[in-house]
Amino acid sequence: MSKTPLTAKAIDAAQPQDKPYKLTDSLTPGLFLLVHPNGSKYWRFRYWLNKREFLQAIGVYPLITLKEARRRATESRSLIANGINPVEQARKEKAIDALNMAAGFKKVAEDWFATRVGGWSESYAKQVRSALEKDVYPVLGKRSIVDITARDVLALLQKKERTAPEQARKLRRRIGEIFKFAVITELVTRNPVADLDTALKARRPGHNAWIPISEIPAFYKALERAGSVQIQTAIRLLILTALRTAELRLCRWEWINLEDATITLPAEVMKARRPHVVPLSRQAVELLQDQFTRSGYSAFVFPGRFMDKPLSASAILKALERIGYKSIATGHGWRTTFSTALNESGRYSPDWIEIQLAHVPKGIRGVYNQAAYLKQRRAMMQDYADAIDSILAGNGNPLEPE
């Protein structure tokens, strides 16, 4: 055995011979470079453990440098000193790496997706995949699901929450479902996302408290307890039209054209004291047609106790209180539900949304027009009503960003 330390210069100068030969390194006992007749050079480490000889493959030169080969051989010697076989240890680590690869977050998420997609509409499935690919996979996709902590997920959610709070809540639910799947399939022992809903900022209850569009199914179920069909219809119309509560309460049949599917509100009932044309979705028209059978003999769409008076200002809030939504939802809050869902979708001009709310956007040029963007707003309102129907049917929200 040579007592001369091996050098990179000597390795590079080593020429192939008719038979394989070794270049040993006196600084690292057991380490040698095997030079093959075809010119390839392989690092090997020979050692003895429990009176048996073993040969460990360390790598190919020059991919594995002399310095790196020495480091790896030294690590192996440390294992041997502790009674651990480096070859067996390498096999175990390779098996663990393979297991971690199989339990990579993206792989688990795709398996979860495959089990759920059969019950979803095509559009909803596309939304779920888009959210995963856009917001989740770039951060967590390549990591082993075993190593992902609640802190990791929270950092992802808080970043999303700064620009799209409702989307952050949806991501939390989806990531949580993926971890539930991982628990069921015994890849992890617990779901680190379980308590993160309390870590995100709560929607502030108050004067104009609102709920996201995703929570409408639970609300509609509770609404059935409101008692009065008229009150139920009024609240459903608030949701579908984004009208202010006062605008709906004071609405008269003479302002409604069911054939053209519009409500034309005069300036005197509008906050901005300008007339306002509201396009109606098919679902809103159907509700009004049904309401006409109850109140068509009154001037008001929603009369109060007396036929010549409108519904009282407190009627809707009292109904919400009766069904358990006090400080959770308000009549005015449905306007926030509407604007949040459409703005977050990214599909509609903010001007259309603002005009539908009877706001006058600062960026709109020219004189305010009561019927501005009517065609676009009509299509937008139909999309919104259809999205609510889709959510109620359990098919997800087609307005979610792609």
From Swiss-Prot:
The keyword DNA-binding applies. Residues 103-183 form the Core-binding (CB) domain. Residues 206-381 form the Tyr recombinase domain. CDD domains: INT_P4_C. The keyword DNA-binding applies. It comes from the Bacteria. Keywords: DNA integration, DNA recombination, DNA-binding, Viral genome integration, Virus entry into host cell. One of its GO terms (molecular function) is DNA binding. Pfam families: Arm-DNA-bind_3, Phage_int_M, Phage_integrase. InterPro entries: CB, DNA_brk_join_enz, Integrase-like_cat_sf, Integrase_catalytic, Integrase_DNA-bd_sf, Integrase_DNA_bind_dom, Integrase_recombinase_N, Phage_int_M. The active site is at R244, K271, H332, R335, H359, Y368 (o-(3'-phospho-dna)-tyrosine intermediate). GO terms for biological process: DNA recombination; provirus excision; symbiont entry into host cell; viral genome integration into host DNA. Belongs to the 'phage' integrase family. Integrase is necessary for integration of the phage into the host genome by site-specific recombination. In conjunction with excisionase, integrase is also necessary for excision of the prophage from the host genome. PANTHER family: PROPHAGE INTEGRASE, PROPHAGE INTEGRASE INTS-RELATED. This is Prophage integrase IntZ. It comes from Escherichia coli (strain K12). The lineage of its organism: Bacteria, Pseudomonadati, Pseudomonadota, Gammaproteobacteria, Enterobacterales. The gene is intZ.
